[in-house]
Amino acid sequence: MKMYARLGLLTAIGVLLFTACASAPITTESTPAGAPRPSARQSQATPRPAVTPLTPIESLGRTGTPIDVDIEAYRLVLDGLVDRPLAISYDELLYYPAVSQVPRLECPGFFVDYAEWKGPLVRTLLEEAGVQAGAQEVQFCDGGALPYCRTLTLDEALLDDTYLAHTVNGQILPPEHGYPIRLVAGSKLGSYWVKWLFHIEVK
């Protein structure tokens, strides 16, 4: 019995570690009765405290192993329930209108960072591709042999703080932080910020 109890404890610890950056929004406060609710393009992310300095790139928390990328051959594919599938090169992505924000990057129990991430809104690409009626969610996957994917609702993907970062703190993304492109989802925990982004699928 002691052996089974020990195995149960180890399993529980493993689950906690795996779900440390689980799928829950940072802000947990409910909207008071009668208060206006945010629109589809307004985020409920926790704002950056005014006195908190930017986290240096070398101090940013990170997980995962960088993926080797042939930047000349790289294409960010956007397909699924769209009228015009896209295959966008890295250089083309750099020419898209970009936003620059300082969202809260949190992996509960491990790190909370504030850095300035810059890149085009996901909404811009979705509008270019033409989202079809009936689409409900958007999946983001890296380019690994066994791709790591996270899914946002379509409304979350259209938020003003959901974008594709190619720059952090004024510098090109380092490989360990998602070069060439990393999803920034300001209303979500760090597990949703997919690094080494290769594929966006509208479902």
Identify the function of each model-found stretch:
Residues 22-30:
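Bacterial lipoprotein signal-peptidase II cleavage site
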Residues 1-8:
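Bacterial N-terminal signal peptides that target proteins for export
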Residues 26, 34, 38-203:
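Structured, non-membrane catalytic/scaffold regions adjacent to prosthetic-group chemistry
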